[in-house]
Amino acid sequence: KGAQVKLFYNDGEYNDWKETFGEDGPKGWNVKYFKGLGTSTSAEFKDYFANKKIVDFVYNGKSSDDTIDKIFNKKRADDRKVWLENYDKNAYLDTSHSSIQYEQFINNEMIHFSTYDCARSIPNMVDGLKISLRKILFSAFKRKLTSEIKVAQFSGYVSEHSAYHHGEASLNGAIVNMAQNYVGSNNINLLKPNGQFGTRLMGGADAASPRYIHTELNPIVDKLFPSLDFTLSIFTVSNSI
């Protein structure tokens, strides 16, 4: 906001700060998500090194060993399931401390990644969609995608309007998969495959380049997701979108 800059090291700290503004949120502030080091400018790097934030990790012997082993040992999948069952989305790591225990980092910080990884990778039982597919569908509704558009162009729209933080190459692939209608692909393809979207013989891997193929909403989507229901939907807010 103007010359003011506030840094947050996790979503929990940011959400707590955002809630201090009430229902309207932090008006006037520009919110920027830093995906990796490449997001930072040269001036920001100079500031990072001028104000180094160094946190020491504390090792607690067997307790730390067991916690680390539980997360990375392939044979302890059942223990990880119990760990994820106890997930609290409101718990987060206090980054103001100069030292943290390995257990604290894993149970209050890494667990957010592991839970989100499951949400991204496993279709939801309610609608059968993963997060990326739901963002694609949301963007299609927002754009009123009733006429065809190039897959490559649509992926750019999705990335801009749904706070998609991952590569557009994977987003292109998700859109292509969402439109495939050969036997063994989708029970119902929510997008139309206007072009060569791959074949059963190659498992869809022979789809043409996203620059050459087009898509649009399948008319059946209006029956599955009636627009009259949208006012009842609970929308997720991400990056102020």
Regions found by a protein language model. Name each.
Residues 1-241:
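Conserved phosphate-chemistry cores used by DNA topoisomerases
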